């Protein structure tokens, strides 16, 4: 059966893992009434753009590995996180900038190259496929009276098409406006990305929002969906609505997994589903995935007659990415070593949180997905006096400081009477 034929459908239980996602809207049709297939980009990619896409993919799988926890589902937008942090990089300097570039996978690329590629990627993804509803938006919100360097604002406006605004963060209307912007950008799917009461030390929010919606090129028949067991990692099962589809689809398999690529609309966007083989856990797959392995998978699909059984699901997910980014080497930005001297003349700035909220709905008709990432910048007050409260077991050393000679060493686990 060819992919252009109407697939027939039936039901059988199967468990699956969603790994890669893109979505679109109601597909336009050509003279024959069919969706017009998109087979090439509107222009060739430059060498730098290819490097940035490769870097973005490396970051995607690095983030997947650091964020993944055994037996826990997750749904992230690496692109949203990358764009929010990419804006923030324009205010960073020195080792802070170097670490951010490395964590995001950009290697030796210059800031000009990175910014230009973000700009072209925005232009490419939005409107690539007329059947795809894709929205990507960026914004920067600063506290009223906080001095922001003009060069930074120019960079985020030009390269990220960012909306820029100065607000009185002490006014409750400020958080309502920021959250309203995110709500609008994600079609109501992401709410309350910043708290109702903005902390007094916050001076800036840098936000990216992404929204996708679309229909499958080959839709599942809702009447064929039945409740079936989904086999959990611990050996138990839960009942889920299992959709079914049979037809020619991009498929590949090896000794570790099966993969099927489900296209949307004009087939420029797709969702890849990876199913571990028996004896291989989904966490094993996560640990083995990197950009090179992904390229091998993505390049290895062949049109094959496939019987697919996929759970219908909807989930919301929220994660603070601080620890994940630190694990990728981005440490200075979060503490007193942070250098954001290209963002403001005020010193003592650091990132207090990188937070992402996401949402996805996969059903018989297609997929809707949204994510928003916020980078929260704070202004550190005067250094706090260190507190040393010796109220638990401790060590002590008596020494002669000038020569370095140690006279006594001791360990106290329960102080004897004085």
Predicted regions span which residues?
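C-terminal, non-catalytic macromolecule-binding modules
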Residues: 291-294, 325
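Soluble periplasmic/extracytoplasmic beta-strand elements of cell-envelope proteins
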Residues: 83-86, 103, 205, 272-274, ...
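Non-catalytic, conformational "gating/processing" segments within enzyme and secreted inhibitor domains
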Residues: 71, 110-279, 284, 299-382
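C-terminal soluble interaction/assembly domains
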Residues: 353-418
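Sec-dependent bacterial lipoprotein signal peptides
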Residues: 1-22
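Detector for small/aliphatic-rich hydrophobic stretches
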Residues: 16, 24-169, 174, 401, ...
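Short, surface-exposed, charged loop/turn segments at secondary-structure junctions
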Residues: 286-290
